[in-house]
Amino acid sequence: AGCAIGAVAPEITGRDTLGNPIKLSDFRGKYVIVDFWDSYCHWCREETPWLRKALEAFKGKNFTILGVSDDRKKELWLAAIKEDHSNWDHLLLPPKTDIFTTYCIKGIPHLILVGPDGKILAKEMRHEELTDVPAKFIK
């Protein structure tokens, strides 16, 4: 399945905050925390400061974050990104995309680490794990 550690992360496609096409494979060659979240998910938005810490910790080390949301209201999605200062790439899924089944997600927030080769290195990370776990791989 596409959710096992060591499996190649299934492709995720959508639109970025400017409406341009964006996909997970655009980030091949980098370590990527994929953050599955929604604007109305309080717990998801509580991860934002931890994600900012990770971005700072691995600055210049081939690392990035991709926020993935299935928000139905684009304006709420954009407002949450701005409000939370989530200054990384974001992808809004097309309606009715069943990414939750593809990635075996039982609930959000759901955060995984994908390696430069596109394989899943870790999953279900929270809080300080967002820095501690990538540190095991990023030298």
Model region roles, listed by residue range:
Residues E46-D84, P95-T101:
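Structural microenvironment flanking redox-active thiols in thiol-disulfide oxidoreductases
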Residues Y31-V32, P109:
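Alpha/beta-hydrolase fold active-site loops
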Residues R28-K30, G60, S86, I105:
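Active-site acidic short loop of glycosyltransferases
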Residues R28, F36-K53:
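Conserved redox-active cysteine motifs that mediate thiol-disulfide chemistry
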Residues H85-S86, L93-I138:
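Thiol/disulfide oxidoreductase modules built on the thioredoxin-like
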